[in-house]
Amino acid sequence: MADVDLNTGPDLPEKTDFGIGCIGAGFIMRDIHLPAYNEAGFRPVAIASRTPANARTAAEENRVPKVYDTWQELLDDPDVEIVDIAYPPDQQLEIVREAASRPHVKGILAQKPVAFTLEEAVEMVKVCDQTGTKLGVNHNMRYDQSMRALKTLLDRGELGTPVVAEIVMNARPHWQEFIKPYGQIALLNMSIHHLDAFRYLFGDPERVVVSARPDPSHDFPHEDGLAFYILEYADGLRAIGLDNCFTWVDHRIDWRVEGTEGVAKGTIGWPDYPEGSPSTIDWTTRELDGKWEQPRWKERWFPHAFKGTMGQLMRAIQDDVEPEISGRTTLGTMALVEAAYRSFREGRAVPLEETRAEAGIA
């Protein structure tokens, strides 16, 4: 009988009562972050938004005691020890600069993507390094239960040497209004989940090859409404992402990893939010001789993974270590996103080292 304890849940620290100041009061903060924090017993103490009425509504729905009209006022509150940002990427650097300058702020959880450009992301990490502020990033797919389970199988060697991996998304994201002027939508705002998940599971690839096209169902200018990519690894592994954001029916996300000794496959439960269903994993090995293990759980990516992204930052503050998903972690992912854009614009395979070196990332 295979060991099916797959460590799908977050490993929370002993201290979870840091005062959290929330910047942003849209869907992701109101309906995902705050419910997850309350369920985990975390302590949101204040919230601010560009639209104060939204902040008041989110506070009432999620028992947040203080509401500020501006994020600057929130940062001045000495009860705020962790700043949780859910703002557009091109506005996060300014907030991080200000938050890191406050001596009572011990940590910052930035939304991904942390910035619109790789250069801004590098600057964000430098700012927090200079002040000693812990910078975590909300790469929440790393805490999707099926991804945690798959990572456990890979780390235990259950699947042998990975040969091919794939994430196939046929689901239509809701592109928020702030995204539309960017001109870059799928790779920067959706594929980044899958690119980062591949890095979490397998590390950095050597090269990326990308094909992308606009989504004909949208009337705003953009270059990448659909994105398809292959990550080429030094050991021969190929990780393939097919992000079809055009689809209008039968929304789903499937993934599969095949190794020399086993196969794992599963689904991501996100496309049917808000009704919601858990992600899944099925796996087998040569040793299991055709039997598939099919563990199941009640937790979902949205909102339960967000306990993990905040919890890993709290643990870093508690233990005075680098966050598991740190600013430096996201630099590798942002460099991969930059390489992906360069690949489809220039029609070539782009080495990841090319964009990392240009940005001065070790």
Task: Please name every model-derived segment.
Residues 42-46, 81-83, 185:
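Short active-site oxyanion
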Residues 134, 141-220, 347:
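Predominantly a Rossmann-like dinucleotide-binding segment in NAD(P)-dependent oxidoreductases
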Residues 2-62:
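N-terminal Rossmann-like dinucleotide-binding module
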Residues 62-127:
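Beta-loop-alpha module in the N-terminal Rossmann-like domain of NAD(P)-dependent dehydrogenases
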